[in-house]
Amino acid sequence: MIDKKEVIAFFDHCAPKWDEELVRNDAVIDRILDNADVGPGCHVLDVACGTGVLFSDYLKRTVASVTAVDISPQMARIAREKAKGTQIRVICGDVELLHFDRFFDCCMVYNAFPHFPDSGRLIQVLAGTLRPGGRLSIAHGMSRDKINAHHKGAANR
């Protein structure tokens, strides 16, 4: 079972270098956002937003709003800096304990799903955040083996 306290400690430790070590594939991200129907006027819930790696992508698509949530205080701090002066609101907290009643057009879980201890519960909670016709998008840019190797290396730095 994944311990949320360990997840917080790990990502707090990694936060300062996260963006410089991030490997982005813009074409893949564009496809993910296209498939999720993220576009003009859309209200997005960005779950486990990290340092805000998708913020610029949302802004390019002229979304109406983004509510970004991360459980790591250090990740959320960096994300808040990136969000200043935009329609992005960053919340530091456990998304499973927050209440958003059917407000969002899209709920995006990018590069984070394996870090949640109860995936079924998470999906149930996130489904309740969506308006009728809204989309829950769960995507990861790396395989499980690559994710584990990446995190093992990051933890040892």
Where are these regions (language model features)?
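A conserved beta-strand element that flanks and buttresses the S-adenosyl-L-methionine
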Residues: M108
